[in-house]
Structures are given as C-alpha cells and as structure tokens.
C-alpha cells in the first residue's frame, strides 16, 4: 500500500516547495524506496502550454507528451524517474473532466458540486499516480499558498485522503517563510503561526514545518514554532538559502528529515546511499575550469523560462569539473552593429527553443557569428530552425529564406508547418509533443556524441525542416545527422569543419540529470573547454 506525502506552502508563493518535495523524494529513493511525484496547480488553464513564460516560466514536456509545470523538471532531475501526464494536474483539467462527465450523464440525477464531485476527481488523480507506478510513496505538491481561494478544493481533497487512507499513511509537510527584520536581524515566527492556523482551520494539521530562512533558526525559535503549531521540535526544519539547489537534499538529510518521515509513515529504514550525490555537489562547489556560454533568447529577463537548459549546462559542466557561466543575451538587441560587442569572448553560443518572430533576426545573426568564428554552437528546437535559415541565406545563397511561421510569403520556406498541423486551429496541446525515436547517422558528430544509432528524445514543435530543400542544402555542406526512422523528419543538423556546430529539433535538456548529463550538452561543454585551452596556448 502506498503512503502519501502532501507538501503545502504558506505566507508567500515561490518558497521552493518544489525543490523541498524533490529533495525529499531523492532522500527516500536513496534509502531504497520507490517514489512518484506530482504537482497540483490551482489555475484554470488545462496546462501551461499556452501561457507566456513570463507568467509561468518554462513548460516542461514529459515522455508521454504532457506540457507541464517546470517543477516536474526538478522532480525528474532529483529522483531520476520519467514522469507522465498524471504527474501534473490543474484545476482546469479537474473541472473539464467533471463537466464532461456531467454532460455524458455520469452524475445523472445529482447536483454537481465542489464537494463531493470536484474533490473526488482530485483524489482520483492522487490515487491514479500510486496505481500507475505501484510505488512505496507518492509525494504531491499543492501549488499556490494556503488561503488562496483557488487552492481550497485541493486542500479539502487531501484532507479527505488522510481520512480514507488512515492518518498513519498520510503526512502533511508545510513549507513556510520565517522572515527577518533588516534593522534588527530578528527572525519573526508570526507569519508561520498564522499560516499553520489557516491550514488547521480547514482540517489539516501539518506533521512537519519546513522554514525557509536566510539566517540560522535558533533552537528557541524552533521550540516556539513547535509549540504554537502543534508539531514536535524535531519536525521543525531549517531550510536556508544555498548556493546550489542540489545541496538541499544534503541539508535535509543533515537534519534527519528522511528518518523522521520514514518513522512517521512506518516505512522500512534502508541504508542511505548519497555517495554520488555528495560527489556531484562537491565537484559543483569546487570547479577546476570556467567557461562562458552566450544564451541568446527573448525571455532572458526571466531565467526560469530556460531552467532545464540552465540545469543541463550545469550537469555537463560538473561532469567536466567546469563552472559554466551564462551570458544572457537579449536576441532583440543582436544585429550587425552589436553582435561582436554582445558575443565576443564567449566560449560557446546556445539558442534555445521559443515561438514567434520577436528576436528571430538576432538569433540568426548570433548563429552566423558562431559559424563564421568557429565558436561551439548548440541549437535547440527553434535554435535548429534558425540555424537552417542562416545556412540557407548565407551559405546556400537563398535570399529571403525563412520559416513560414515568421514570413508566410517567404520565397524560400526552408522551415514550414508540419503537414499534419495544417488543419489544426486550436493552440493548446496540439503540437508534436513527447518522446519520438531519432535515427542517428554513422560518421557524424551526432553519432560520435550519442554512440548509438537510435535515440529517443522529447519534442515540442509545429514547424519542421522543409524536405524540398534537403538536397540543395546538403549539397552546399549542411549535414543531416539525425532523422525520424521513416526519414521524413530532420531531427539533427550539423556542420563539418567546425569544432562543434550541432542543432536539434528536439529538446535534449529535458532528459539531462545531475548524475547523467545529456551527451549533447556534455560534448558542447567539452568543445568550449577545448576551444578555451587552445586559445590560451
């Protein structure tokens, strides 16, 4: 029988509930327990797929093609498990499902209400993950903050789960803020007390309180929080700011959080094995080398829009004992006059995924700079499409070459809408999504990187390489090194006579892990290191 852990948040949003939940998942897994994770988001959107990155950050894509919250990326990276669409549930999905059932007549004769119909649907999603994975523990993060109107049905549902499953099989962890006053440096517990009071008023008594704080939490404050919030002192956990999110599991282990949780849920206490994780954190703290990559995008003011790319670069850097510093370059500011000033000195250039025509010409100019100056380049999704456009214009001589996404009347549509997308009007959930096989061509840089002729990667796109230009562009030197097994879709392109110029239609960043960096990022960092060493000599 699965045990259930629910992670809620109080006082303010963006406290790091996701990292806390993911870290606990890592600790439990390190003791031999199987773990599944999920996130409940109280917004009415079906998924974040159509939201602006400025509203939501990155959209993380699962193997089965769900567009999900960026916290799922943290979950996958920490517990090293591929999650599914069942791991991200929004209020929109819940209401959609209930209304659909009502229209079909599933509730015939009943007045459909928040309780029990909405709450039953939420509970079913919790249990579904446990059944799907057949795991020892399900960790569910509740998005938002206690007290939000949108969160109430979710909190009511998890209260009911505790009754149905037995209190001994359910644990509530509340993540809260303990702020300090700048003039005195005094830590204040009152916001935490009020947050827990709010939680208890709807029938949930937290079993553990994780206190986000910039300063150490003195023993007397722990005792005060324990007294006023009705938990044991050892269940008041200090969660201070750290340099790297990968230190958080070690900080929680130091305070015996995993032991407390395992004892509370009456789970077997296996031997903890965090040796490789500790080694990773140690290498991350003490790099032997440094490289700088210019990330050219249009959402560079919000780094969370590219969080999986950032983490994949970190993983690859640690593999090479190298700190990868990111130079955030706004694509809209890149042009012939500014390109040298903005990109000079970068050891590598990366153009990530994106949509729309804003900043496109800047990205194309940055790619030209990488190609002409033999700077290692990695293009992801849109970064591949822009690389094809740049090559078509400046090497193949196709003046005005473009994607029909940006210029429907381009004389040379080297990137075009996928045929199966042409009759689709709706935006949400209609792209080519999820994992697909890619055949890697022997004798190419991609094959050298993967060392495998068939790989599986995650996608999120509507547009593709236009095969009418395949023969022309390859005759001019473009190398197609990855194809769909039926050879219809171009998945990877590269250039010869270049230290590292590789671009993919898929998103390799979604499959990178701290202890297993993605090979494309690993070799990209290696190429940057080699270039830096050669230049120094």
From Swiss-Prot:
Record field: catalytic activity: UTP + L-glutamine + ATP + H2O = CTP + L-glutamate + ADP + phosphate + 2 H(+); L-glutamine + H2O = L-glutamate + NH4(+); UTP + NH4(+) + ATP = CTP + ADP + phosphate + 2 H(+)
Residues bound to CTP: 13, 148-150, 188-193, 224
GO BP term, pick one: pyrimidine nucleobase biosynthetic process
Binding site for ATP: 14-19, 71, 240-242
Known EC number: 6.3.4.2
Active site, renumbered: 381 (nucleophile), 507, 509
Positions annotated to bind Mg(2+): 71, 141
PROSITE patterns to which the protein is assigned, alphabetical: GATASE_TYPE_1
Official protein name in the record: CTP synthase
Organism, scientific name: Caldanaerobacter subterraneus subsp. tengcongensis (strain DSM 15242 / JCM 11007 / NBRC 100824 / MB4)
Higher taxonomy: Bacteria, Bacillati, Bacillota, Clostridia, Thermoanaerobacterales
Gene that encodes the chain: pyrG
């Amino acid at each position: 029988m699965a045990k259930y852990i629910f992670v809620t948040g109080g006082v303010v949003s963006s406290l790091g509930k996701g990292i806390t939940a993911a870290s606990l998942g890592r600790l439990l897994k390190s003791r031999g327990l199987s773990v599944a994770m999920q996130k409940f988001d109280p917004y009415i959107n079906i998924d974040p797929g159509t939201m602006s990155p400025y509203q939501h950050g990155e959209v993380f894509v699962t193997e089965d093609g769900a567009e999900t919250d960026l916290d799922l990326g943290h979950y996958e990276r920490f517990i090293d498990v591929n999650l599914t669409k069942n791991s991200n549930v929004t209020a929109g999905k819940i209401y959609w499902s209930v209304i659909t059932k009502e229209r079909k007549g599933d509730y015939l004769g009943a007045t459909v209400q928040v309780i029990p119909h909405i709450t039953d649907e939420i509970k079913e999603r919790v249990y579904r993950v446990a059944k799907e994975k057949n795991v020892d523990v399900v960790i569910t993060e509740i998005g938002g903050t206690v007290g939000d109107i949108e969160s109430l049905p979710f909190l009511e549902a998890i209260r009911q789960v505790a009754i149905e499953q037995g209190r001994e099989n359910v644990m509530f962890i509340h993540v809260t803020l303990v702020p300090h006053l700048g003039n005195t440096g005094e830590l204040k517990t009152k916001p935490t007390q009020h947050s827990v009071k709010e939680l208890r008023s709807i029938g949930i008594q937290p079993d553990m309180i994780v206190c986000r704080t910039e300063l150490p939490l003195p023993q007397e404050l722990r005792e005060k929080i324990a007294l006023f919030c009705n938990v044991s002192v050892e269940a008041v956990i200090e969660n201070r700011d750290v340099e790297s999110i990968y230190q958080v599991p070690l900080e929680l282990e130091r305070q015996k959080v995993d032991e407390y949780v395992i004892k509370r849920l009456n789970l077997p206490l296996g031997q903890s094995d965090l040796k490789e994780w500790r080694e990773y954190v140690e290498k991350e703290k003490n790099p032997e080398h440094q490289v700088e990559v210019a990330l050219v995008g249009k959402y560079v003011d919000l780094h969370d829009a590219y969080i999986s790319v950032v983490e994949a670069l970190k993983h690859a850097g640690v593999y090479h004992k190298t700190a990868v510093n990111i130079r955030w370059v706004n694509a809209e500011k890149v042009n012939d006059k500014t390109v040298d000033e903005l990109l000079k000195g970068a050891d590598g250039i990366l153009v990530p995924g994106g949509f729309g025509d804003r900043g496109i010409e800047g990205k194309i100019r940055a790619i030209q700079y990488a190609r002409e100056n033999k700077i290692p380049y990695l293009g992801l999704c849109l970064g591949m499409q822009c690389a094809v456009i740049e090559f078509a214009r400046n090497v193949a001589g196709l003046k005005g070459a473009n994607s029909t996404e940006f210029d429907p009347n381009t004389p040379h549509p080297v990137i075009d809408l996928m045929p199966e997308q042409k009759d689709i009007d709706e935006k949400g959930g209609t792209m080519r999504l999820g994992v697909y096989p890619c055949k890697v061509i022997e004798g190419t840089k991609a094959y050298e990187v993967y060392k495998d002729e068939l790989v599986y990667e995650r996608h999120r796109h509507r547009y593709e390489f236009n095969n009418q230009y395949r023969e022309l562009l390859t005759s001019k030197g473009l190398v197609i090194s990855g194809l769909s097994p039926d050879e219809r879709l171009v998945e990877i392109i590269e250039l010869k006579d270049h230290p590292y110029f590789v671009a993919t239609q898929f998103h390799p960043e979604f499959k990178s892990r701290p202890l297993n960096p993605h090979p494309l990022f690993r070799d990209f960092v290696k190429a940057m290191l080699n270039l830096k060493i050669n230049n120094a000599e």
